[in-house]
């Protein structure tokens, strides 16, 4: 910093002896001169009268105070000394020095003892190898390294037992309950606002679980919804009494209609036997209008068909009670899947009309149907006289049918019809890593005009949980299935299975090429465990499947469930797949399959299931069920060899053929079918032999490593196996029911036993033959037998000769 003091000039001597300044940027000026020698006397003449300045000059310099540096250094020294005294010295004294002493003592002691055995230098290395081997084993077995256990694989294929063990720990029952609660929070009939909310929820769940493809596939189909409904009856005094009805008194796909003062007749379960009995007794007569009062049977659409056949103008169904609650109403669909499933408008998916000859086979009833409660049914029954005949209720009870004119009723049903209404399916996909042109479908129905907790919501919640389990296994182990998996939530179930049917109709060829199995879980419920004598508890599951897969399901029975396996025996969203030869499997709980109350009523709410799930045993049953579903689906999609057992397939058909022959002896010639089965049996033996050889090479000796040539052979076998089902179809379909192409497996038009032995008839095998027998047309029955034999032989020949993927067009 510059001083305000201005210096005067000095001599060179003075400059050389000047004291340096504190700052190099300034000049220190001297106000006096210094002389080394004393002054001489000769200099007295020189006067040095120099007057000092009145005030000393002011200097402003930036000079650091050395005391500050000293203070800082002292503080750091104190910290350093404190750290050394309190931490380093105790650490050295109490830990490091003892450890060093031990490290010197232990080797010396070890060498001392080892020297008694042998050379310590060699023995020390020997024990070191053992110790390090133990460490390596622990690390490898713990899964910290990326080995077979950590990756869930062995060689080229997955080790499912490892994946399942992880899945057992990953089941999120809380998520299952949350999904079930939300889906059950509102009625969600097809095409309603409730359905829109639910299918968006499912779509978001698919997205959140990271499915590669999530797609909404919508279709415009005929649908109807609750509207105006009324039933009135007249007493002996001709006074009119109204039944109190609501929107719950509704059968989806019922026709609209209005009747005035028509006789009411009670018909029990409405079987052909019941109504023929009424007709023989003149209780009902041709040309006279009447309304049938019926108890619900297992197959409601068949009741409607028979009622139409006998001239009924409307049907009133009496609901089953729910415990002591006799006011619940069961809203069962009345579409007619016997002729075909799908859009009930009579139009094909592309809008073209159905052929004229098929108009009478539309999928919708032609008469009004209305469900009422048990209480209301009793009220109407009490008005019938003792005239007419006694009719079996099907519940070990009998009631009077009444007679014409006993009770007159008015019926008015006006539903809200939408000729073309949007119905969506939600599709998600996990892509396979090997044969990505082949896939299975895991599906569940979505819609209910009520809350639908038991059916179908339980199955939908299970579907979402299975998706989550698959993805958790995928992310944990880097797992991918060998083949594709599709997850589908079907819409339009109450409208004659419109969603699944339209999907099959629009994409039939790609589906037949890719899909080799469909698993439907719509009818699942809590598998309530029953206690046995040995103290174990086991729930029950019913599996209806294709004969090719029967051995697979019997072999993979779950230790906590009693599983019964049979052929498919009822309608559902799987029906259009079955009709076109695609093997299907339906996993059900008996109570849900039979639609026991409160299913299909307004009482089927989440609160009831929530209380059931408070029991730990029921919680465990649900967890076991989800793991079992994951197990069977993973085995189907990720095992190298398809689980299609041809010998079991042949034996099953042969067994059902024998039943048919016993039911109708000396009526039909089954030689052509037997020849076809023998051809398939030979193929089955070759497949079993090849399978055994493959397992010996890959698993027994190859440790999961498959040679390339063997892989190609395996893919060829798998592809040929997937064509078995589709090749049992006839392009023309069944007589009068062209929708059903599968000549081996499918529904009989009317499922009533007319055999002599009774009770031993299968209504879902050889449907064309059974239709002809029901009509007493034995010539047509033999033609259908011969057609089945021809199809079996041709499909076997194609299997042997096949080089390309050939199917009926």
Curated annotation (Swiss-Prot):
Additional remarks: Present with 300 molecules/cell in log phase SD medium.
Low complexity composition-biased segments: 37-50
Principal EC category: hydrolase
Primary gene name: TRE2
Major localization class: membrane
Family per record: Belongs to the peptidase M28 family. M28B subfamily.
Domain PA, first and last residues per copy: 255-349
Ranges where the record places region Disordered: 1-66
Residue intervals on the Extracellular side: 147-809
Cytoplasmic side stretches: 1-125
Membrane topology summary: Single-pass type II membrane protein
Glycosylated position list: 228, 669, 736
Name of the protein described by the UniProt record: Putative zinc metalloprotease TRE2
GO BP term (any one): protein transport to vacuole involved in ubiquitin-dependent protein catabolic process via the multivesicular body sorting pathway
Keyword entries, A-Z: Glycoprotein, Hydrolase, Membrane, Metal-binding, Metalloprotease, Protease, Signal-anchor, Transmembrane, Transmembrane helix, Zinc
GO molecular function terms listed in the Swiss-Prot or TrEMBL record: carboxypeptidase activity; metal ion binding; metallopeptidase activity
Organism: Saccharomyces cerevisiae (strain ATCC 204508 / S288c)
């Amino acid at each position: 910093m510059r001083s305000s003091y201005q210096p005067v000039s000095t001599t060179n001597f003075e400059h050389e002896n000047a004291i340096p300044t504190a700052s190099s940027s300034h000049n220190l000026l001297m106000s006096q001169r210094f002389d080394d020698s004393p002054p001489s006397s000769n200099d007295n003449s020189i006067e040095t009268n120099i007057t000092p300045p009145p005030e000393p000059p002011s200097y402003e310099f930036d000079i650091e105070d050395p005391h500050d540096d000293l203070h800082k250094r002292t503080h750091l020294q104190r910290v350093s000394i404190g750290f050394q005294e309190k931490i380093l010295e105790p650490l050295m004294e109490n830990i490091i020095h003892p450890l060093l002493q031990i490290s010197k003592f232990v080797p010396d002691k070890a060498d001392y003892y080892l020297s008694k055995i042998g050379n310590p230098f060699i023995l020390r290395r020997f024990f070191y190898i053992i110790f390090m081997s133990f460490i390596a084993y622990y690390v490898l077995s713990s899964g910290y390294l990326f080995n077979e256990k950590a990756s869930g694989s062995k060689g080229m294929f997955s080790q499912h037992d490892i994946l399942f063990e992880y899945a057992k720990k990953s089941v999120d029952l809380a998520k299952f309950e949350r999904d079930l609660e939300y889906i059950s929070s509102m009625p969600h009939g097809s095409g309603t606002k409730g359905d829109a909310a639910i299918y968006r929820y499912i779509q978001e769940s698919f997205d959140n679980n990271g499915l590669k493809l999530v797609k909404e596939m919508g279709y415009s189909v005929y649908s109807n919804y609750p509207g105006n409904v009324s039933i009135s009856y007249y007493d002996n005094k001709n006074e009119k009494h109204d039944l109190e009805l609501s929107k719950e008194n509704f059968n989806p796909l019922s026709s609209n209609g209005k009747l005035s003062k028509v006789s009411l007749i009670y018909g029990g379960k409405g079987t052909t036997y019941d109504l023929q009995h009424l007709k023989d007794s003149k209780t009902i007569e041709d040309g006279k209008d009447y309304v049938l009062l019926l108890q619900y049977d297992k197959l409601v659409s068949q009741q409607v068909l028979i009622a139409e056949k006998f001239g009924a103008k409307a049907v009133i169904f009496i609901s089953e009670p729910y415990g002591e609650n006799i006011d619940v109403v069961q809203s069962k669909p009345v579409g007619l899947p016997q002729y075909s499933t799908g859009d009930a408008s009579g139009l094909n998916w592309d809008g073209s009309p159905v052929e004229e000859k098929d108009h009478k086979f539309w999928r919708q009833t032609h008469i009004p149907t209305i469900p009422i409660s048990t209480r209301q049914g009793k009220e109407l029954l009490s008005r019938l006289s003792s005239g007419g005949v006694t009719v079996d209720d099907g519940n070990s009870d009998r009631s009077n049918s009444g007679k014409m004119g006993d009770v007159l009723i008015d019926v008015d049903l006006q539903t809200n019809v939408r000729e073309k209404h949007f119905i969506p399916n939600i599709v998600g996909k996990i892509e396979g890593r090997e044969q990505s042109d082949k896939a299975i479908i895991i599906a569940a129905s979505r819609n209910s005009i009520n809350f639908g907790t038991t059916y179908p919501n339980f199955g939908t919640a299970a579907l979402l949980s299975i998706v989550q389990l698959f993805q958790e296994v995928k992310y944990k182990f880097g797992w991918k299935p060998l083949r594709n998996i599709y997850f589908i939530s079907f819409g339009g179930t109450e409208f004659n299975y419109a969603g699944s049917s339209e999907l099959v109709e629009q994409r039939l060829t790609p589906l037949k090429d890719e899909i080799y199995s469909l698993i439907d879980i719509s009818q699942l419920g809590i598998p309530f465990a029953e206690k046995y004598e040995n103290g174990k508890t086991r729930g029950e599951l019913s599996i209806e499947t294709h004969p090719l897969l029967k051995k697979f399901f019997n072999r993979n029975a779950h230790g906590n469930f009693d599983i019964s396996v049979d052929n498919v025996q009822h309608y559902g969203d799987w029906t259009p797949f079955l009709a076109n030869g695609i093997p299907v499997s339906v996993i059900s709980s008996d109570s849900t399959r039979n639609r026991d109350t409160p299913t299909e009523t307004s009482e089927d709410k989440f609160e009831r299931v929530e209380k059931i799930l408070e029991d730990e045993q029921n919680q465990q049953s649900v967890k076991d069920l989800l793991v079992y579903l994951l197990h069977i689906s993973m085995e189907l999609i990720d095992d190298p060899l398809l689980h299609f057992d041809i010998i079991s397939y042949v034996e099953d058909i042969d067994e059902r053929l024998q039943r048919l022959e016993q039911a109708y002896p000396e009526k039909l010639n089954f030689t052509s079918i037997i020849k076809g089965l023998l051809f398939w049996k030979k193929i089955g033996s070759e497949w079993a032999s090849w399978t055994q050889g493959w397992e010996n090479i890959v698993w027994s000796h190859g440790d999961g490593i498959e040679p390339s040539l063997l892989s190609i052979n395996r893919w060829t076998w798998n592809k040929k196996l997937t064509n078995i089902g589709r090749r049992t179809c006839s392009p023309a379909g069944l007589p009068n029911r062209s929708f059903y192409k599968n000549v081996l497996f499918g529904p009989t038009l009317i499922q009533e036993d007319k055999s002599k032995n009774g009770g031993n008839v299968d209504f879902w095998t050889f449907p064309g033959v059974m239709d002809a027998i029901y009509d007493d047309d034995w010539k047509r029955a033999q033609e259908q037998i011969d057609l089945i034999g021809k199809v079996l032989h041709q499909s076997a020949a194609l299997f042997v000769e096949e080089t390309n993927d050939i199917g009926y067009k």
